[in-house]
Amino acid sequence: MTIKFASLILAGLGLGSGALGSVTFRREESSWTNDSLTSVFAQQAKGLFLPRTVISFQGQEWFENVTERWDIYAPPTFKVSVSPSTEKDVESAVKLAAKFKIPFLATGGRHGYGTTLGKLKNGLSIDLSLLNQFSIDSKAATITVGPGVRFRDIFTPLYEAGFQVPTGTCSCVGMIGATLGGGIGRLNGLDGLMIDALESARVVTADGRTLTVSEKENKDLFWGMRGAGQNFGVVVSATYKLKPLYAAGVWTNVDLIFSPDKNATYFDVVTSMEVPPQLTIASVVTYNATLDEPQLIATLTWTGPRDEALAAMKPILDVGPRHSEVTEATYATLPRVATFGTTDAVCAPGQIYDIYGVGLRRLDSAAWRSTFSKMARFYAAEPAGRASSILYETWPVQATVAVPDDATAYPWRDASTYVLIQMRWDRPGSPLERAADRLGAELRSDLSATGGYQGAGPAVYVNYAHGDERLEDIYGARKLPRLAKLKKQYDPGNVFRFHHALPTKYP
């Protein structure tokens, strides 16, 4: 049986993931004026696209909706947007941009971040939100999604069909965009990374061809797409292998708030725990405006019933939270109830997030306690920065490390915690920006120093990268020679370069 869905979005706001592919040509990004780009599309696009494909310009409502981003720190800027309604129209948009040497970024949901995206100025947006169809094939146990599909679109249909698939935790993120960097989340211990579920994809490459990549077709490119995919093309569809619901789709969510004096004990417990595949721990250093003090929020999830969950979580519960909420959920409802049901607030677009990330193989309680203390001092000194936070995602790794390291381009399979440092302030151009950015980089360095990876820099999940990292920090030195060869083969002109670009030669 095949179940098909198509929730057509006419004015998408905060639609999901980061850039699926970015292409630039031999003209300087800033050399295009509004009039020249408008002229190209007014004259050349006639009859090129199907009627449902939308061309929009700066100042128009559609344009503003489909170029609005979740993070407005160092964002790309655009003069024109094309919203293709078919795969063929994606190809046409790429070819038109190539012909006139127009730099562009293809986006599935605009949830991506990183300062390298901001190098695109006054370019073309290829908005993929209309390609939001997906189909579940129950017999084959697969789901095929378009680049406009977000995580929240698939949870209920999959649950009702009796399946699950690895996803991230933020429900508004685009599925394909998150996959290309690796795809971490709550099912990493049971089912592995999102790239481990990826069965095949259709990719528009730098020369305008659409290729199918899988273990049987274009296998070399398929390897590179799984961990560094933003460097090789625009993904117009992807098929994932599904697993039957674990524990009949029953989940238990426990949200906790700890007072600041508990941070040392809490971190001691979390960093010393053996995390079974059913358990996930998300720890957030944040600020409590009501009590005027820093605090720790923990979201613990368990794939199974309440009694099992509370037994597995007992070491953390024994630390003594000042507030707790236990919710019995399902695979479909968990993303909406987790972290006190704050998913809508977290997904609100148009906010400043200066993000630094680091992956940890070794968990050092002293380093974590130090980051709490530094954030507490920052909160006290900079009231305008109190929306800043540190998120520690401690995911189980059993299924992730069961996949051989050389099976995909992803370099950090044995990372047991991913840290997302989110420095925030109230408005662009704030004098707080320099101090906040400096602290973000410092915290990343502190955690990297005890994180268990060898090398001169941090081990950084590409989807959490800031933009100042070395290539080795993001892609891993052992992966780069093969990735560089693929880059030379499929994109020798380095046209896909706005998302932590790969070289065509390494070393």
From Swiss-Prot:
Q: Which Pfam family name is an example for this entry? A: BBE
Query: Does this UniProt record's set of keywords contain Signal?
Result: yes
E.C. no: 1.-.-.-
Q: What induces it?
A: Expression is increased in rice-extract medium (REM) and is correlated with the production of pyriculol.
Q: Which InterPro entries match?
A: BBE, FAD-bd_PCMH, FAD-bd_PCMH-like_sf, FAD-bd_PCMH_sub2, FAD-linked_Oxidoreductase, Oxid_FAD_bind_N
Glycosylation site positions = N34, N65, N263, N288
Q: In which pathway does it act?
A: Polyketide biosynthesis
Q: Which Gene3D superfamilies match?
A: 3.30.465.10, 3.40.462.20
**Location of the FAD-binding PCMH-type domain:** 73-245
What's the protein called, per UniProt?
A: FAD-linked oxidoreductase OXR1
Organism, scientific name: Pyricularia oryzae (strain 70-15 / ATCC MYA-4617 / FGSC 8958)
Q: What is the lineage of its organism?
A: Eukaryota, Fungi, Dikarya, Ascomycota, Pezizomycotina
